[in-house]
Structures are given as C-alpha cells and as structure tokens.
Amino acid sequence: MKKITRIGIGGPVGSGKTAIIEAITPLMLDLGIKVLIITNDVVTTEDARHVQRTLKGVLVEEKIIGVETGACPHTAVREDPSMNLAAVEDMESRFPDTDVVLIESGGDNLTLTFSPALVDFFIYVIDVAAGDKIPRKNGPGISQSDILVINKTDLAPYVGASLEVMDRDSKFMRGDKPFIFTNCKTGEGIPELVHLIHDMALFDVPIKEAS
C-alpha cells in the first residue's frame, strides 16, 4: 500500500495557518502532488468551510474536512490524536492515490508539537504582527519544527517589527533548520515554501516540470 505523507501545520491563533494551506495547495496541485486537507477547530468546522470556499474549483470539497475536537488544540494533535488519526485513515482509504495530507491544528501557543503517531513532518507558522521577539521566545514550535514559517511580512512596518531581527533570532534558535518569510496576500515566499516542502518531505513524489 502506498505511503501517504502526513504534514502537520501548527501555530498561534491568527498566524495564517489556513491562509498558508490555501496558498500552497494550488501550487502543489500544479506540480502534480495530490493533496488532502484536514483542519482542526475546537467547537466548529469553520476553517474547513473557509478552505472549501477558497479552493472551490481547485480541490474537490470531499478532499477537505474539518475535525471538531472539543478539546485543547494540542491535545487533539499530540496527547490524544485519536480523532485526527481516524479522520486521516478515513480520508486515505477513500483517496488512496493521495501523496500528502495537510493537517492544520487549532490555534495554540509556542509549545505546540504534533504526535509522531499523527504526522511525519511539522511546519510551524508565526506572524510578524505578534512582534519581532517571537523567535527568541523559543519553544518547541520555533526550535523543533521541520520548517518555521514567518508569515505576514507586509505588516512589519505597521507594528514596528524588524524582519532583520526575526531573521537573526530564527537562525540562532534553529541552527541549520530552515525557516522562510511569507506573505500570502502577495505570494512572497510561497513557491519557495512549496519546493522546500517537496525537497524535505515529498522528495519521492515526482513533480511536473515547469512549462
């Protein structure tokens, strides 16, 4: 049976996790990467509905589902990921030719991580509007994620944040682990993020050459 890669995407409330998924999915599909999406919310499936609306005509609605966890966001993806595991297994059984499942956690804090029983790869998303001190606050999401995404770069001048400081501190906290600046409104960094994901997590998936 084909091994389907599972990628967890976590980060604080409002950091742009859903927007990142909505931005990278069309580019992944253009490369021939087959995608499923699972979102997590505590008491609704609002993120899933938002993704379905945004990606209408790009990804069929049945390949995007929401999990209503009813619990603390990190519990549902770390301590007891049973609801997400059930959702993943159901989706993979219905779409066995899939290459990757993107699993978005509910908004949480800098301590968020995913259970290795649930995901193979972990992307952590922070945003510039939270302040340029966030990378040096550290935490598992900052230092241990496979890729750190620093989103909403366009907001830096409005909140007095320095991208140079965030770049410096991210290098210090992460060592050789990659991080990338993105802006989902303009597309800045999104193609680079997609290729980074492919090279690190989906390297065995053939991709289409750019025409």
UniProtKB/Swiss-Prot annotation:
Question: What are its GO cellular component terms?
Answer: cytoplasm
Chief subcellular location equals cytoplasm
Q: Which domain of life does this protein belong to?
A: Bacteria
Mind listing the UniProt keywords for this protein, alphabetically? Chaperone, Cytoplasm, GTP-binding, Nickel insertion, Nucleotide-binding
User: Per the record, a Pfam family?
Assistant: cobW
Which positions does UniProt annotate for GTP binding?
11-18
Where located?
Answer: Cytoplasm
InterPro entries for this protein? CobW/HypB/UreG_nucleotide-bd (IPR003495), P-loop_NTPase (IPR027417), UreG (IPR004400)
Q: Which GO terms describe its molecular function?
A: GTP binding; GTPase activity; nickel cation binding
Q: Tell me, which GO biological process terms does this entry list?
A: urea catabolic process
Family in the record: Belongs to the SIMIBI class G3E GTPase family. UreG subfamily.
The record's subunit annotation is:
Homodimer. UreD, UreF and UreG form a complex that acts as a GTP-hydrolysis-dependent molecular chaperone, activating the urease apoprotein by helping to assemble the nickel containing metallocenter of UreC. The UreE protein probably delivers the nickel.
Role according to the record: Facilitates the functional incorporation of the urease nickel metallocenter. This process requires GTP hydrolysis, probably effectuated by UreG.
Name of the molecule in the record: Urease accessory protein UreG
